[in-house]
């Protein structure tokens, strides 16, 4: 269990970044965190990782208030990992396999176990075809997959993804969505922070919407996005499938593929 209860956070310069924020990562298998720039998404990620301590309120981990000592933070980070928007922030080696194996080797895990786990996660993210390729020759999307593999190899329960589809072409976005859904089916709890509203709508089963460091609204994905007034308050736009439903009278579809399957049947 990982959640926050009424946390607020103020930076040293006096800027109030979060105010009375409560979120529960057990609300869904893939949870979306949305809001305009400066709404507090990145700050909240740092709270969930124990990097920043709330000014007030509590972060709960495995049913207990998080203690900010070395032992407690080590236990937290064995269960919670993050993949940053820019994969170059997380890739340190020129060789893909060595980079993914880096954390495991630092922990002193046997080389046999390291090789097995690295192979498994590279298969999970579809990176085996370029596992021996120098990192500098990888595409941006391939680097993103390597960064995810580096987080997955630690076998954490929760995965925090910061803008996972940013900078990707349509094929890269499709591959990333498939990876995220595959991980959720394998039992990972995933929190996605993104400006890609269509991604959040299609892939998430629960959403938290932030505005100026507070939770403006939360709920099941369709429920949140159908409330246009909240979307506008947050400085966001509705997903295109929601717009089709509300403005053109189409049935409410969750997936793009479902919409095109429906229209194909109608045309035929």
Swiss-Prot record:
Belongs to the ABC transporter superfamily. ATP binds at residues 35-42. GO terms for biological process: cobalt ion transport. Transmembrane segments: none annotated. Gene3D superfamilies: P-loop containing nucleotide triphosphate hydrolases (3.40.50.300). It comes from Listeria innocua serovar 6a (strain ATCC BAA-680 / CLIP 11262). Pfam families: ABC_tran. Keywords: ATP-binding, Cell membrane, Membrane, Nucleotide-binding, Translocase, Transport. This is Putative ABC transporter ATP-binding protein lin1170. GO terms for cellular component: ATP-binding cassette (ABC) transporter complex.
């Amino acid at each position: 269990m990982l959640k926050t209860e009424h946390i607020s956070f103020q930076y040293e310069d006096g800027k109030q970044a979060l105010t009375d924020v409560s979120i529960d990562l057990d609300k869904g298998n893939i949870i979306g965190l949305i809001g305009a720039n400066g709404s507090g998404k990145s700050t909240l990620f740092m709270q969930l990782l124990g990097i920043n301590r709330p000014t007030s309120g509590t972060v709960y981990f495995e049913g207990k208030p998080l203690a900010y000592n070395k032992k407690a933070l080590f236990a937290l980070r064995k269960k919670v990992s993050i993949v940053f928007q820019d994969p170059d922030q997380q890739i340190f080696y020129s060789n893909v396999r060595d980079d993914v194996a880096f954390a495991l080797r630092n922990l002193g895990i046997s080389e046999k176990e390291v090789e097995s786990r690295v192979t498994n996660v590279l298969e999970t993210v579809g990176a085996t075809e370029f596992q021996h390729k120098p990192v500098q020759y990888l595409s941006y999307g391939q680097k993103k997959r390597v960064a995810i593999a580096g987080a997955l190899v630690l076998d954490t329960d929760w995965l925090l993804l910061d803008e996972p589809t940013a900078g990707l072409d349509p094929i890269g976005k499709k591959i990333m969505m498939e990876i995220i859904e595959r991980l959720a089916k394998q039992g990972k709890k995933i929190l996605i922070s993104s400006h890609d509203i269509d991604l959040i709508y299609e892939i998430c089963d629960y959403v938290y919407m932030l505005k100026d460091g507070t939770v403006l609204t939360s709920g099941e994905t369709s429920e949140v996005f159908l409330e246009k007034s909240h979307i506008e308050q947050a400085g966001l736009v509705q997903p295109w499938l929601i717009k089709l439903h509300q403005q053109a009278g189409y049935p409410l579809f969750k997936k793009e593929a479902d919409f095109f399957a429906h229209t194909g049947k109608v045309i035929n």
